[in-house]
Amino acid sequence: MNEGNKFIRRHDLTSLIRLTIAYKAIFAMAEKQRGTITKLAKDFLISRTFVYMLANSLLETSQIKANDFFPPAIKENSSIDHILSLRLEGKCSIGSISTYLKRFGFKKSSVGYISQILNQFGSVLPNTVTLKEEETVKIVYASDEIFSKTKAILITADPISTAILKIEIVDKRTAEAWINHWETIEDNGCIPISLVCDGGTALIKGHKDYLSDLIRQHDTYHGIAHVLGIWDTRFEKNAYDAIEKEYDSNVVLNSEMDENKLTGIIKKYEESQKNTQEKIEAYESFHYLYVSMINELDIFDKKGKLRDRQKAEANIEACLDLLETEIELKKPVKKIRRILDDLLNYFEIAKVILEELLVKMPDIDEEGLRSLCLAWQWGKKKIKAKSPRRRRNCAQKEVYYYEEAEMFIAKEFGKVKDQVLKELNEIVQSSSIVECINSIIRPYLNSSKNQITQETLNLIMFYLNHRRYIAEKRKKQTPYELLTGQAQSKDWLDMLMEKYETNCH
């Protein structure tokens, strides 16, 4: 099969076979036989949607009025596929789905019916990812809290596979709620090797009471960039505003005016010049310290060697001292100092990973390993880069160091590269994956008018874990495949329908 083709013409499915499939499907739905559609799909290696399509085609070409002879099973099942696809893939509101179904002649199209269908399907799904019996995976927990109006939602994801491990609505955000949350994940086979989260009180206490033997990595984005980024923008805006005022004063000065007013105008212009210079210097000083602190988060130096954690912490502390004394930023500095002890914990994880790599691959060229480390680091920066220019620069550096690594590691370079990157990806600096998932989930919450239910969250989690990526490095893979290493042969919608039919049966 050509991997690039999503659909292919099945020449082995003759007209007679298609007619047989359609007839059996119509009969099964008329008799309300559960599981027949799924069995037909399995027996003939086709999708359930294709089975319904054949059944509909037979009814139309035979000019049979389904309502006169059979219950409206085909329309109902077909509308269910539409409901699930529109809600999860299209992120449509229930009201919009109702309008769509009415337009295309589906009888059961009321808001109440759609809500009932979504609730029924969500009720048969767990809110925790489930592995096969006795199967376990060791992963990083990236945990955070999101909100739907007053409802708190706890979510934990695997930052490497992007799979949602658990999502649940809770009454209160307490340490006990987080402990129960993590216990359930662990009971289902996902063993934590470290925890990445922000500085939430309940999260910190939950870690202390339940996961104290694991490293807790504070989110580096929330630790520095989130705190100081807004100040960087503010200082820059102040500088540009001052430049604009100076320019306006200069225009007035160069225009014709009474000599009696000239002295006052000159004085005002000189004040504008002085103010502009002060604002520019303030911005440049702050920006230099801000960028210096961000650079201290790098794991590897310019030669690809692991940086010293103590030196990095000392440099950040020196920058904080200057921000406090010279620029007088008291509160932001205090906030960063509060979490500084946990901010660079990933250095310890990186140290262990590099040691394990040298044990697993004793013959690896050390220069080549350093080049791979730099390529990996520039790849991470490329993902984080916001400006196209910055992104291009990072991409060029990434390619350069991969090429350099290949010069040192000529033999089985692809295999060595994949192994090294797999290990390095376990170094997690932030819980940005949860922020990303939050941005994906937010449209569902908004289209629900924030009347979110656990059943809806179960559906969203199932879809996000089993839908296939269509671009970037995870292209053609699903989060669940990446988490478990097991191939997923079916579409998420077929899997969901089968799961529903099995549970109902």
Spell out what each predicted region is.
Residues A28-K42, E89-K102:
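Short, charged amphipathic recognition helices of the HTH superfamily
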Residues N67-S85, E89-S96, R103-L214, I230, ...:
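RNase H-like nuclease fold core
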Residues T220-R307:
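Charged, amphipathic alpha-helical linkers/stalks
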Residues Q277-R307, G368-R390, K397-V416, V420-S431, ...:
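C-terminal domain-tail junction helix/linker
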